[in-house]
Protein backbone atom coordinates (compact mmCIF):
# COMPACT_ATOMS: atom_id res chain seq x y z
CA UNK A 1 0.00 0.00 0.00
CA UNK A 2 1.43 3.36 -1.02
CA UNK A 3 1.81 6.26 1.36
CA UNK A 4 -0.98 8.10 -0.48
CA UNK A 5 -3.39 5.16 -0.07
CA UNK A 6 -2.50 4.86 3.61
CA UNK A 7 -3.25 8.56 4.08
CA UNK A 8 -6.62 8.26 2.31
CA UNK A 9 -7.49 5.20 4.40
CA UNK A 10 -6.70 7.02 7.67
CA UNK A 11 -8.70 10.11 6.67
CA UNK A 12 -11.67 7.99 5.58
CA UNK A 13 -11.61 6.02 8.83
CA UNK A 14 -11.49 9.26 10.82
CA UNK A 15 -14.47 10.68 8.95
CA UNK A 16 -16.45 7.49 9.54
CA UNK A 17 -15.72 7.67 13.26
CA UNK A 18 -16.57 11.37 13.36
CA UNK A 19 -19.81 10.73 11.50
CA UNK A 20 -20.60 8.09 14.08
CA UNK A 21 -20.09 10.64 16.86
CA UNK A 22 -22.37 13.13 15.11
CA UNK A 23 -24.98 10.45 14.59
CA UNK A 24 -24.75 9.40 18.22
CA UNK A 25 -25.15 13.00 19.38
CA UNK A 26 -28.15 13.54 17.14
CA UNK A 27 -29.75 10.41 18.55
CA UNK A 28 -29.10 11.25 22.19
CA UNK A 29 -29.99 14.95 22.33
CA UNK A 30 -33.60 14.11 23.22
CA UNK A 31 -33.20 10.48 24.33
CA UNK A 32 -34.86 10.26 27.73
CA UNK A 33 -35.09 14.03 27.84
CA UNK A 34 -38.64 15.23 27.68
CA UNK A 35 -39.91 18.78 27.12
CA UNK A 36 -42.77 20.56 28.89
CA UNK A 37 -43.88 23.45 26.69
CA UNK A 38 -46.08 25.31 29.19
CA UNK A 39 -44.97 26.12 32.75
CA UNK A 40 -45.18 29.10 35.09
CA UNK A 41 -43.05 30.22 38.04
CA UNK A 42 -45.03 31.20 41.14
CA UNK A 43 -43.36 33.96 43.12
CA UNK A 44 -42.51 36.12 40.14
CA UNK A 45 -45.50 38.27 41.07
CA UNK A 46 -43.72 39.61 44.12
CA UNK A 47 -41.10 41.20 41.92
CA UNK A 48 -43.83 43.49 40.63
CA UNK A 49 -45.52 44.44 43.90
CA UNK A 50 -44.03 47.91 44.28
CA UNK A 51 -44.04 48.68 40.59
CA UNK A 52 -47.61 47.46 40.22
CA UNK A 53 -48.85 49.91 42.85
CA UNK A 54 -47.25 52.75 40.90
CA UNK A 55 -48.61 51.55 37.57
CA UNK A 56 -52.12 51.26 38.96
CA UNK A 57 -52.04 54.93 39.91
CA UNK A 58 -51.23 55.99 36.35
CA UNK A 59 -53.87 57.29 33.98
CA UNK A 60 -54.07 57.08 30.20
CA UNK A 61 -50.34 57.79 29.83
CA UNK A 62 -49.87 54.15 30.81
CA UNK A 63 -51.04 53.09 27.33
CA UNK A 64 -51.19 56.13 25.03
CA UNK A 65 -51.80 53.89 22.01
CA UNK A 66 -55.22 52.87 23.35
CA UNK A 67 -58.48 54.47 22.15
CA UNK A 68 -60.42 56.47 24.78
CA UNK A 69 -63.08 53.77 25.22
CA UNK A 70 -60.44 51.14 25.83
CA UNK A 71 -58.65 53.35 28.36
CA UNK A 72 -61.95 53.85 30.18
CA UNK A 73 -62.53 50.10 30.31
CA UNK A 74 -59.01 49.61 31.62
CA UNK A 75 -59.54 52.25 34.32
CA UNK A 76 -62.69 50.47 35.51
CA UNK A 77 -60.87 47.16 35.59
CA UNK A 78 -57.99 48.80 37.46
CA UNK A 79 -60.35 49.94 40.20
CA UNK A 80 -61.71 46.40 40.52
CA UNK A 81 -58.25 44.91 40.70
CA UNK A 82 -57.13 47.43 43.32
CA UNK A 83 -59.78 46.04 45.63
CA UNK A 84 -58.40 42.54 45.32
CA UNK A 85 -55.69 41.11 47.52
CA UNK A 86 -52.11 41.98 46.62
CA UNK A 87 -49.53 39.24 46.32
CA UNK A 88 -46.59 39.32 48.78
CA UNK A 89 -43.07 39.30 47.47
CA UNK A 90 -41.43 36.05 46.50
CA UNK A 91 -38.34 34.72 44.76
CA UNK A 92 -38.87 33.34 41.28
CA UNK A 93 -35.34 31.89 41.04
CA UNK A 94 -36.12 29.77 44.10
CA UNK A 95 -39.25 28.61 42.31
CA UNK A 96 -37.07 27.84 39.30
CA UNK A 97 -34.90 25.64 41.54
CA UNK A 98 -38.04 23.81 42.58
CA UNK A 99 -39.14 23.43 38.96
CA UNK A 100 -35.80 21.88 38.02
CA UNK A 101 -36.21 19.34 40.83
CA UNK A 102 -39.70 18.53 39.54
CA UNK A 103 -38.35 18.09 36.03
CA UNK A 104 -35.56 15.79 37.18
CA UNK A 105 -38.11 13.50 38.82
CA UNK A 106 -39.61 12.65 35.42
CA UNK A 107 -36.59 13.08 33.18
CA UNK A 108 -37.91 16.33 31.72
CA UNK A 109 -34.87 17.91 30.14
CA UNK A 110 -36.34 21.29 29.19
CA UNK A 111 -39.35 23.40 30.09
CA UNK A 112 -40.71 26.57 28.57
CA UNK A 113 -41.58 29.12 31.26
CA UNK A 114 -43.86 32.04 30.51
CA UNK A 115 -46.18 34.56 32.18
CA UNK A 116 -49.86 33.56 32.29
CA UNK A 117 -52.30 35.59 30.17
CA UNK A 118 -52.79 38.90 31.91
CA UNK A 119 -54.62 42.19 31.78
CA UNK A 120 -52.98 45.44 32.73
CA UNK A 121 -53.08 46.17 36.45
CA UNK A 122 -54.04 42.67 37.54
CA UNK A 123 -52.61 41.81 40.97
CA UNK A 124 -49.71 39.46 40.42
CA UNK A 125 -49.19 40.59 36.83
CA UNK A 126 -45.59 40.59 35.66
CA UNK A 127 -43.59 41.07 32.45
CA UNK A 128 -41.47 38.42 30.76
CA UNK A 129 -38.35 40.23 31.97
CA UNK A 130 -39.12 38.94 35.48
CA UNK A 131 -38.27 35.45 34.17
CA UNK A 132 -34.89 36.32 32.71
CA UNK A 133 -32.90 35.63 35.89
CA UNK A 134 -34.34 32.12 36.10
CA UNK A 135 -33.70 31.40 32.43
CA UNK A 136 -30.16 32.73 32.80
CA UNK A 137 -29.60 30.53 35.85
CA UNK A 138 -30.63 27.40 33.92
CA UNK A 139 -29.83 28.18 30.27
CA UNK A 140 -29.83 24.51 29.24
CA UNK A 141 -33.07 23.68 31.05
CA UNK A 142 -35.45 26.66 31.01
CA UNK A 143 -36.65 28.28 27.78
CA UNK A 144 -38.30 31.71 27.65
CA UNK A 145 -41.86 32.26 26.47
CA UNK A 146 -43.21 35.82 26.42
CA UNK A 147 -46.24 37.90 25.54
CA UNK A 148 -48.77 37.03 28.24
CA UNK A 149 -47.87 40.17 30.17
CA UNK A 150 -47.42 42.49 27.18
CA UNK A 151 -49.22 41.35 24.02
CA UNK A 152 -52.21 39.68 25.64
CA UNK A 153 -53.25 42.85 27.54
CA UNK A 154 -53.13 44.84 24.32
CA UNK A 155 -55.49 42.36 22.65
CA UNK A 156 -57.84 42.14 25.64
CA UNK A 157 -58.03 45.92 26.08
CA UNK A 158 -58.59 46.81 22.43
CA UNK A 159 -61.94 46.39 20.74
CA UNK A 160 -61.45 44.84 17.30
CA UNK A 161 -63.23 47.77 15.65
CA UNK A 162 -60.89 50.27 17.33
CA UNK A 163 -57.61 48.87 16.01
CA UNK A 164 -55.65 51.51 14.08
CA UNK A 165 -52.16 51.93 12.68
CA UNK A 166 -50.83 53.33 15.95
CA UNK A 167 -52.02 50.27 17.85
CA UNK A 168 -50.70 47.90 15.18
CA UNK A 169 -47.29 49.59 15.27
CA UNK A 170 -47.11 49.45 19.07
CA UNK A 171 -48.11 45.78 19.08
CA UNK A 172 -45.56 44.90 16.42
CA UNK A 173 -42.79 46.78 18.23
CA UNK A 174 -43.45 44.89 21.45
CA UNK A 175 -43.60 41.55 19.62
CA UNK A 176 -40.27 42.23 17.90
CA UNK A 177 -38.77 43.16 21.28
CA UNK A 178 -39.96 39.80 22.62
CA UNK A 179 -38.39 37.94 19.70
CA UNK A 180 -35.09 39.73 20.21
CA UNK A 181 -35.17 38.84 23.91
CA UNK A 182 -34.71 35.21 22.91
CA UNK A 183 -38.27 33.98 23.43
CA UNK A 184 -39.16 30.74 21.65
CA UNK A 185 -42.93 31.26 21.76
CA UNK A 186 -45.51 34.04 22.05
CA UNK A 187 -47.45 33.14 25.17
CA UNK A 188 -49.46 32.67 27.09
CA UNK A 189 -52.16 34.27 24.94
CA UNK A 190 -55.88 33.72 25.44
CA UNK A 191 -59.04 33.92 23.35
CA UNK A 192 -61.33 32.68 26.14
CA UNK A 193 -60.18 32.23 29.72
CA UNK A 194 -63.02 31.39 32.09
CA UNK A 195 -62.82 32.51 35.71
CA UNK A 196 -62.62 29.52 38.08
CA UNK A 197 -62.63 31.28 41.48
CA UNK A 198 -63.00 34.81 42.94
CA UNK A 199 -59.26 35.48 42.61
CA UNK A 200 -59.12 34.20 39.05
CA UNK A 201 -59.75 36.24 35.90
CA UNK A 202 -62.20 36.15 33.00
CA UNK A 203 -60.69 37.16 29.66
CA UNK A 204 -62.18 36.95 26.19
CA UNK A 205 -61.19 38.28 22.80
CA UNK A 206 -62.13 36.74 19.45
CA UNK A 207 -59.38 34.67 17.81
CA UNK A 208 -59.92 36.59 14.55
CA UNK A 209 -59.13 39.89 16.29
CA UNK A 210 -56.86 42.05 14.06
CA UNK A 211 -54.08 41.84 16.65
CA UNK A 212 -54.28 38.04 16.68
CA UNK A 213 -53.98 38.15 12.89
CA UNK A 214 -50.94 40.41 13.20
CA UNK A 215 -49.45 38.08 15.80
CA UNK A 216 -49.91 35.16 13.41
CA UNK A 217 -48.06 37.08 10.71
CA UNK A 218 -45.23 37.89 13.11
CA UNK A 219 -45.10 34.29 14.32
CA UNK A 220 -44.71 33.16 10.72
CA UNK A 221 -42.13 35.83 9.95
CA UNK A 222 -39.94 35.03 12.96
CA UNK A 223 -40.62 31.28 12.93
CA UNK A 224 -41.85 30.94 16.51
CA UNK A 225 -45.23 29.47 17.56
CA UNK A 226 -48.18 31.00 19.39
CA UNK A 227 -49.26 29.48 22.72
CA UNK A 228 -53.06 29.84 22.97
CA UNK A 229 -55.46 29.22 25.86
CA UNK A 230 -59.04 28.83 24.63
CA UNK A 231 -62.23 26.98 25.47
CA UNK A 232 -63.86 25.08 22.60
CA UNK A 233 -67.30 26.53 21.79
CA UNK A 234 -68.96 25.85 18.43
CA UNK A 235 -71.94 28.21 18.91
CA UNK A 236 -72.93 30.91 21.39
CA UNK A 237 -74.31 29.35 24.56
CA UNK A 238 -75.44 30.19 28.10
CA UNK A 239 -72.61 30.04 30.58
CA UNK A 240 -72.68 26.71 32.48
CA UNK A 241 -74.12 27.11 35.97
CA UNK A 242 -70.96 25.77 37.62
CA UNK A 243 -68.96 28.63 36.09
CA UNK A 244 -71.50 31.23 37.17
CA UNK A 245 -71.28 29.89 40.72
CA UNK A 246 -67.49 29.73 40.64
CA UNK A 247 -66.89 33.37 39.75
CA UNK A 248 -69.03 36.47 39.28
CA UNK A 249 -66.74 37.70 36.49
CA UNK A 250 -68.05 35.06 34.10
CA UNK A 251 -70.78 36.58 31.88
CA UNK A 252 -74.25 35.02 31.52
CA UNK A 253 -73.44 33.86 27.98
CA UNK A 254 -70.30 32.77 26.14
CA UNK A 255 -69.57 33.52 22.50
CA UNK A 256 -68.50 30.87 20.01
CA UNK A 257 -64.74 30.52 19.64
CA UNK A 258 -64.25 27.82 17.01
CA UNK A 259 -65.38 29.68 13.84
CA UNK A 260 -63.06 32.61 14.61
CA UNK A 261 -60.29 30.21 15.63
CA UNK A 262 -60.46 28.52 12.24
CA UNK A 263 -60.22 31.92 10.57
CA UNK A 264 -57.07 32.57 12.59
CA UNK A 265 -55.58 29.25 11.50
CA UNK A 266 -56.43 30.02 7.87
CA UNK A 267 -55.09 33.57 8.04
CA UNK A 268 -51.45 32.51 7.80
CA UNK A 269 -50.66 28.83 7.31
CA UNK A 270 -47.01 29.41 8.20
CA UNK A 271 -47.99 30.43 11.74
CA UNK A 272 -47.76 27.47 14.12
CA UNK A 273 -50.50 27.68 16.76
CA UNK A 274 -50.35 25.41 19.81
CA UNK A 275 -53.73 25.03 21.51
CA UNK A 276 -53.00 24.52 25.19
CA UNK A 277 -54.74 22.56 27.97
CA UNK A 278 -56.24 19.77 25.89
CA UNK A 279 -57.74 17.54 28.58
CA UNK A 280 -58.79 20.50 30.75
CA UNK A 281 -62.28 21.20 29.42
CA UNK A 282 -64.61 23.62 31.21
CA UNK A 283 -67.40 23.62 28.61
CA UNK A 284 -67.66 20.04 27.35
CA UNK A 285 -66.90 20.41 23.65
CA UNK A 286 -63.17 19.60 23.58
CA UNK A 287 -63.73 16.09 22.23
CA UNK A 288 -61.45 13.72 20.28
CA UNK A 289 -63.69 13.93 17.15
CA UNK A 290 -63.46 17.73 17.18
CA UNK A 291 -59.68 17.62 17.63
CA UNK A 292 -59.39 15.11 14.78
CA UNK A 293 -61.48 17.30 12.50
CA UNK A 294 -59.45 20.43 13.24
CA UNK A 295 -56.05 18.72 12.97
CA UNK A 296 -57.01 17.19 9.63
CA UNK A 297 -58.22 20.52 8.28
CA UNK A 298 -55.49 22.80 9.64
CA UNK A 299 -51.86 21.65 9.19
CA UNK A 300 -50.56 24.55 11.31
CA UNK A 301 -52.52 23.49 14.42
CA UNK A 302 -50.84 21.64 17.29
CA UNK A 303 -52.23 20.42 20.62
CA UNK A 304 -50.64 20.51 24.08
CA UNK A 305 -52.05 17.94 26.47
CA UNK A 306 -52.68 18.35 30.19
CA UNK A 307 -53.82 15.73 32.71
CA UNK A 308 -56.02 16.36 35.74
CA UNK A 309 -55.75 14.91 39.28
CA UNK A 310 -58.13 12.23 40.55
CA UNK A 311 -59.82 14.84 42.72
CA UNK A 312 -61.09 16.38 39.49
CA UNK A 313 -62.17 13.09 37.94
CA UNK A 314 -65.57 14.47 36.96
CA UNK A 315 -64.00 16.95 34.54
CA UNK A 316 -65.27 16.56 31.00
CA UNK A 317 -63.17 15.10 28.19
CA UNK A 318 -60.18 13.99 30.23
CA UNK A 319 -57.51 12.31 28.11
CA UNK A 320 -56.89 9.55 30.70
CA UNK A 321 -58.60 7.23 33.16
CA UNK A 322 -58.12 7.20 36.94
CA UNK A 323 -54.86 5.26 36.49
CA UNK A 324 -53.52 7.92 34.11
CA UNK A 325 -53.68 5.62 31.12
CA UNK A 326 -54.64 7.34 27.87
CA UNK A 327 -58.24 6.62 26.96
CA UNK A 328 -58.73 4.68 23.68
CA UNK A 329 -60.40 7.53 21.80
CA UNK A 330 -57.57 9.91 22.68
CA UNK A 331 -54.88 7.33 21.94
CA UNK A 332 -56.40 6.85 18.50
CA UNK A 333 -56.19 10.61 17.94
CA UNK A 334 -52.54 10.71 19.04
CA UNK A 335 -51.67 7.79 16.77
CA UNK A 336 -53.38 9.53 13.85
CA UNK A 337 -51.39 12.75 14.41
CA UNK A 338 -48.21 11.65 16.24
CA UNK A 339 -46.22 14.70 15.13
CA UNK A 340 -48.82 17.28 16.22
CA UNK A 341 -49.07 16.66 19.97
CA UNK A 342 -46.86 18.07 22.76
CA UNK A 343 -47.00 18.21 26.57
CA UNK A 344 -47.91 21.31 28.58
CA UNK A 345 -48.57 20.61 32.26
CA UNK A 346 -49.58 24.22 33.00
CA UNK A 347 -48.21 24.15 36.55
CA UNK A 348 -47.18 27.05 38.79
CA UNK A 349 -43.93 25.88 40.38
CA UNK A 350 -43.62 27.37 43.86
CA UNK A 351 -40.71 27.18 46.29
CA UNK A 352 -40.95 27.14 50.09
CA UNK A 353 -40.01 30.80 50.51
CA UNK A 354 -42.75 32.01 48.18
CA UNK A 355 -46.23 33.08 49.36
CA UNK A 356 -48.12 30.17 50.83
CA UNK A 357 -45.04 27.97 50.99
CA UNK A 358 -44.22 24.91 48.94
CA UNK A 359 -46.92 23.84 46.50
CA UNK A 360 -47.28 20.21 45.50
CA UNK A 361 -47.37 20.17 41.69
CA UNK A 362 -50.43 17.98 40.96
CA UNK A 363 -50.80 18.89 37.30
CA UNK A 364 -47.13 18.38 36.54
CA UNK A 365 -47.11 15.04 38.34
CA UNK A 366 -50.22 13.59 36.74
CA UNK A 367 -49.46 14.96 33.28
CA UNK A 368 -46.06 13.33 33.17
CA UNK A 369 -47.39 10.14 34.78
CA UNK A 370 -49.81 10.01 31.85
CA UNK A 371 -47.01 10.55 29.33
CA UNK A 372 -45.08 7.69 30.92
CA UNK A 373 -48.02 5.41 30.12
CA UNK A 374 -47.90 6.12 26.39
CA UNK A 375 -46.51 3.51 23.98
CA UNK A 376 -42.70 3.99 23.72
CA UNK A 377 -42.59 5.48 20.21
CA UNK A 378 -45.48 7.84 20.89
CA UNK A 379 -44.00 8.74 24.27
CA UNK A 380 -40.78 9.81 22.59
CA UNK A 381 -42.55 11.91 19.97
CA UNK A 382 -45.13 13.57 22.19
CA UNK A 383 -42.80 13.79 25.19
CA UNK A 384 -39.99 15.65 23.47
CA UNK A 385 -39.28 15.29 19.77
CA UNK A 386 -42.31 17.26 18.60
CA UNK A 387 -41.58 20.12 20.98
CA UNK A 388 -37.96 20.28 19.84
CA UNK A 389 -39.14 20.73 16.26
CA UNK A 390 -42.15 23.02 16.82
CA UNK A 391 -40.37 25.36 19.25
CA UNK A 392 -36.93 25.17 17.56
CA UNK A 393 -35.17 23.97 20.72
Predicted regions and their residues:
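Mid-to-C-terminal alpha-helical segments outside catalytic/metal-binding sites
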Residues: 25-37, 42, 46-55, 60-110, ...
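Catalytic pocket-lining loop regions of alpha/beta-barrel enzymes
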Residues: 201-343
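Bacterial N-terminal signal peptides that target proteins for export
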Residues: 1-7
Amino acid sequence: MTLKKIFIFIVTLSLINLKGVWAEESKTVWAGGFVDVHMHLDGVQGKMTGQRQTNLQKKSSEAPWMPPKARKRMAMQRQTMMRQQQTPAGDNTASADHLIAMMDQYGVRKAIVMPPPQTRGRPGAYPYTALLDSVKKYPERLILGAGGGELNPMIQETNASEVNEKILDAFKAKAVEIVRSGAHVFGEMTALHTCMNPKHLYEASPPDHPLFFLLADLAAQYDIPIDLHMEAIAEDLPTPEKLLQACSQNPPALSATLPAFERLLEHNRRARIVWQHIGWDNIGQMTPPLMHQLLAKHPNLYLAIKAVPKADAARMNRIHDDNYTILPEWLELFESFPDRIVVGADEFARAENVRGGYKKPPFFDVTWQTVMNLPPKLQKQIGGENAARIYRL
